[in-house]
Amino acid sequence: MIKNFKRISLLIAISFICSKSYSQSDEEELPPPNILWISWEDVSQTFGCYGDTYAVTPNIDELAEDGIVYQNAYANSPICAPARSTLITGQYASSYGGQQMRVRSVPDREVRLFPQLLRKSGYYVTNDGKYDYQIVFDKDIPFDRESGGNYIWNNGNFRAPWNGRNGDQPFFSVINFTRTHEGHSSAINSGWEDKVEDLLGEKAHDPAEANVPPYLPDNRTTKECIALHHDNITYTDSLSGIILNKLEESGLAENTIVFFWGDHGWGLPRGKRWLYESGVKVPLVIRVPDKYKHLLRDGQKPGTKTDELVSFVDFAPTMLSLAGVSIPDYMQGQPFLGKHKKPPRDYVYVYRDRADETYDMMRGLVTKDYLYLRNYRPYLPYAQTIRTMERHPSMQDLREMHKADKLNEAQGKFFQYPKPVEELYDLENDPHNINNLAKNSNYEDELEKLRSRHLEWMKEINDVGLIPEPEFDMMKWPEGKGQRTGRPYFESEYRNYIDGKIEVSIQCPTSGASIVWKYAGSDSWHLYDDQPIVVGPNQILQAKASRLGFYTSKIATYQLGDPLTKTKDPSANHVPWQKKVNDQLINKILELKSLDYQKGDHLEAYYEYLDAEETPVRYWATMGIRNHSNTEKEISRARDKFMALTHDESPAVRIEAAHGLCKWGHYDVGRPVLRNALEHRQEAVRLYAMNVLDKMDEKPRMILPFPKIPLYTGGDYSHRIMCRIYKRLGIKPKDLEYATPDQVQNIRNTYNTIILDNLWDYNFK
């Protein structure tokens, strides 16, 4: 790989010695560097360059020999879409609602994705098709595949991502590899493991030699899964080598900064989706050509390792810093390379909320010495059921061994219930995060320091994860659906035609929107750059706009002779959610939730918050009372309160109250509340109710037949839970997992009680 890179680097180094070095003026005259991202899915630091002797990763290892290996690089979220959302915005996803899996968040109007800023500064920006940013609605954003033009990216060509640019135009290209994804490492007995072994030959991994972490059983199933995962890593390493060689063969390597990184930890149990090191610590290797070495930190040299703490929220400002572009104030990360680099950070912050169909809420922070975790829903077990995770053979094996009581203490921790409210781990002596020190008196000072810092951070960013997802969705879309960007309009300072032509500018009534335009009949949309556009006879100018998180506007048209009329912003009367979430609300919720870890019985304190005006406060208070009411007297008092709460204006509060009532045997009151929630127009309300039913074992039978409700369009998550419930109740499907839209419609025409895209032969009438 990179056959000539070292030789060329050596020649350049010699020439530098002869000429002493680049002067400051030379550095200022350098063109902006190209930047190439090579991202892999679901990988921890299981590479040769990180000291993993089981790994066969020659291409990434060689990249590391010429680059910097970051030993303390972290994804801020342990699951793909929230992690990528953080990457692309430079903001913590939990500050704008992107921390849940598969959501449509609405950032502030001023926010731009960093590739937009690079493109505006003159970069040619490409992405090979992996977006997953949790912000956009329509296919036009971020990439209009039909037109070839778009609001963010120039194109999405994988084979030659930097082709298509003008001359020496600098480029930023993203190439994503998916073979290491959790789904592929679970493909035991699918035929792929045999195919990849044939492809790798002697590089294939022997399961017997696999290194098994202490939190997983050291048995054949685990070893086979780890071996297949490493085979996929080696296979993807070869693909990465092809890209790097192509970069060199194009003559671009000496002008291109290369980032290799993984989107979060590996896909085995207790990795992906959890905030342990196995879930958030990722590989990061950065190669900077010698001519751009001034963009590194002082003392950084090729072929070295650094223990500097960096995280995904830092990537966006770092890209802008490397390109010499100003960093917007709204970005919450800090650049660690480039013109605007900041001193190394002391903390990395991590978060996890809903993972696929299953709710939880965890926050944490990492230093070089400790990992601190805060479980905001400690009454939930770690090992909740998540469909994708349950398909993994190692997860199936783990559950079987747990049922048979064959797990040791470290392995069985994954099934601990309830979870500890706080966790603290010594990273040097306990790299796998097994021994929780939170209740060890020797670490009280450290625990208090990290707890306080995590609370300060949540307040600094106004962490909206404290707001139940159904309530937050209603803050975003009171009418139950997203806002549409206003249709662009045209302006001109020249009312008289010049040579039969006119220059027009394009405006959008929705602030924060980006505009694209084209002439009618053209296949390509162009990003509008605020420069006038000439419209001549027989030409029709078309324009459309999109604000991040909004639907794309309707197309506007202009031709000579048309009146120049301003359009209106459809969202003008909509109060943005940012004005509904304030410091007072966040502080009040955190004050309430501090009862979780305070010593003593605080049941009475939860009641003090039950009549709060703020819906999220009432929600958390209801949950606290449900989980702390254990005696007959306590349950009797709570029952009376919860009866009244089933009429609360908030669906989330009603569902939580119904949860408690069903828990205490009052199905006659709880059941109608849950049934009504399943018919709610908001997807998140339905999913909240489904999560309650999923925790009830045989009790969901009390709610059958389920009402007919709309499909969950955000990722079929309600459908997944429905499938689990029916299977648990012994209802045998013909094909419970997959159904086409036509099959769904046919079934609905046959059975009035069928609700989601399921197929079965059971009559519920």
Annotate each PLM feature.
Residues 565-576, 598-611, 632-646, 667-677, ...:
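Amphipathic alpha-helical scaffolding segments comprising HEAT/armadillo-like alpha-solenoid repeats
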Residues 420-434, 461-462:
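C-terminal substrate/ligand-recognition segments
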Residues 2-9, 15, 21-417, 431-452, ...:
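Formylglycine-dependent sulfatase
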Residues 332-333, 464-473, 736-742:
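Short, flexible loop/turn segments with low-complexity composition
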Residues 613-614, 649-650, 681-682, 714-715, ...:
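Short inter-helical turns and helix N-cap capping residues of alpha-solenoid HEAT/ARM repeat scaffolds
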Residues 361-363, 423, 504, 531:
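Residue-level detector of beta-strand structural context in well-folded domains
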Residues 4, 23, 445-452, 465-597, ...:
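Short, compositionally stereotyped local motifs that mark structural "simplifiers"
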Residues 582-600, 608, 616-633, 644, ...:
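Structural detector for internal amphipathic alpha-helices that build alpha-solenoid repeat scaffolds
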